Regions:
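A glycine- and small-aliphatic-rich helix-loop capping segment at beta-alpha/alpha-beta transitions
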Residues: 57-67, 83-86, 106, 110, ...
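Internal gly/pro-rich beta-alpha loop/helix module
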Residues: 136-222, 234
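Short beta-strand segments
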Residues: 45-47, 69-72, 119-124, 183-189, ...
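Accessory alpha-helical/coil subdomains and C-terminal extensions
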Residues: 176-182, 204-285, 289-294
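Glycine-rich oxoanion-binding loops at beta->alpha junctions
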Residues: 72-115, 155-156, 160-161
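N-terminal amphipathic/basic leader segments beginning at the initiator methionine
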Residues: 1-41, 45-46, 53, 77, ...
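Conserved mixed alpha/beta catalytic, RNA-binding, or beta-rich assembly cores of soluble enzyme
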Residues: 292, 298-301
Length: 301
């Protein structure tokens, strides 16, 4: 193995990951021109596997929040954060702690004025961790398990989840109104579809009831009358109280990798930031590119 190439690869990977770490992403978003907090209270709601780190960075950057809640996966709380209560809950299937912590968040944002700002920090895993079901919790857990076992992709999963929830599909933003929401989103889905990341609690929903019903039929979900009615009920399509800053995405990671390659003297070519397939298929694809360059007498790393 070429030791120099291996060292360069390690450097490129480290530089790329550093650019999309939660703390760096939050600092970047809070320093942007898009962040304009109101004159009133500042509340923080952080949800996802990176919620604690995002909240810790946000509070340090802002100096204070009036009140806050972190909802993250078991084992992911690293300590206390001033003014913030931290909860751990179930992932990838929501549990009673998910439901209880989400209820606390909803209570916190009740009766806010239009002078208040809700800083909403969202990362991967939010669909399970942030949940107030519109159907019995046990039924939601069973449907989630069936979708997981059936091989449903994240878009299919979240299309169903949004309609069975009081906080997903833009409904959390409605609960916060008339307060303004500044949402910082760490994207864990290719293409950054905002309404699908953590099932879009503060984003207008682009999916339809017809799509949800089709997915339910595809995976033969045993729906109660209550659940079936929820799937046909439409979600918010317009939200006027939300500003969203997407960061920490695959696109940003790819750009950081390109910059690191160039710094090391390579001529980088970004083939795609949307590759979605099995690892063996990706390996075959990259191998064919390497063979093409080798056949033309070109160097390729």
């Amino acid at each position: 193995m070429n030791t120099a190439l291996r060292q360069d690869a390690d450097t490129i990977i480290a530089s790329s990951l550093k650019a999309v770490l939660p703390d760096a992403a939050v600092r970047r978003a809070l320093g942007s021109e898009a962040f304009h907090p109101q004159d009133g209270r500042i509340l923080l709601v952080a949800v996802g596997k990176a919620a604690w780190q995002m909240a810790h960075t946000a509070v340090a950057a802002l100096g204070r929040v009036d009140e806050g809640i972190v909802i993250t996966k078991y084992g992911h709380v690293r300590g206390t954060i001033p003014g913030v209560t931290c909860y751990e809950a179930g992932h990838p299937v929501p549990d009673e702690n998910s439901f209880a912590a989400t209820e606390k968040a909803l209570t916190m944002v009740q009766n806010l004025t239009d002078k208040a700002t809700v800083l909403f920090l969202l990362s991967g895993g939010g669909s399970a961790l942030f949940e107030k079901p519109l159907i019995p919790g046990a039924e939601l857990q069973e449907l989630t398990n069936r979708l997981l076992a059936g091989g449903a992709d994240i878009v299919e999963m979240n299309t169903i989840r949004k309609r069975l929830s009081a906080v997903k599909g833009g409904r959390f933003a409605l609960a916060c109104a008339p307060a303004k929401i500044f949402s910082i989103v760490l994207s864990d889905i290719l293409g950054d579809p905002l309404d699908m990341i953590a099932s879009g609690p503060a984003v207008p929903d682009s999916s339809t009831g017809e799509q949800a019903i089709a997915i339910a039929r595809k995976y033969r979900l045993p729906l109660s009358k209550e659940a079936n009615a929820c799937l046909t009920q439409e979600t918010p399509k317009v939200l006027n109280n939300v500003t969203t800053q997407i960061t920490g995405s695959v696109r940003e990671l790819s750009k950081a990798a390109v910059d690191a390659c160039r710094t090391l003297g390579y001529t980088p070519v970004l083939l795609t930031d949307h590759l979605c397939c099995e690892a063996r298929e990706a390996g075959s694809f990259l191998g064919s590119i390497a063979r093409t360059h080798a056949g033309q007498g070109q160097k390729f790393a």
